[in-house]
């Protein structure tokens, strides 16, 4: 399930060129495959950043860890805190200005891609 069903002509999306062999890997690996949806529970606008709390499914929450990585609406981010199925991210002003994240409000649904390495680690643990 993704938010694509709500897109219309003119909907702004976050797009990044694919990594080429030999390029520097400056973040975490993003496959571009949405695993599901997270719902914005709360937005706090702080002096030097915005803090978002998001809720996801229990199935996807098991792959999310504090200081780990998630991709939300195509933007690679570091998880700040996790409590059960709710997690938070901190967004700096530059990211708010150059992505669609600046327009996020409580109640909105966003695409969620969990960390690929966390997904693989969980699968390996299941197979033991």
Task: List where the protein language model places each region.
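Conserved loop->alpha-helix
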Residues: 1-128
């Amino acid at each position: 399930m993704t938010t694509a069903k709500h897109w219309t002509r003119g909907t702004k999306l976050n797009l990044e060129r694919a990594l080429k062999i030999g390029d520097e890997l400056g973040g975490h690996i993003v496959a571009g495959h949405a695993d599901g949806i997270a719902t914005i529970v709360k937005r706090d606008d702080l002096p030097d950043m915005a803090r978002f709390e998001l809720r996801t499914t229990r199935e996807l929450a098991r792959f999310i860890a504090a200081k780990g990585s998630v991709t939300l609406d195509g933007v690679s981010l570091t998880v700040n805190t996790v409590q059960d199925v709710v997690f938070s991210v901190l967004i700096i002003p530059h990211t708010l200005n150059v992505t669609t994240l600046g327009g996020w409000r409580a109640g909105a649904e966003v695409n969620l891609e969990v960390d690929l390495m966390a997904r693989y680690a969980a699968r390996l643990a299941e197979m033991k």
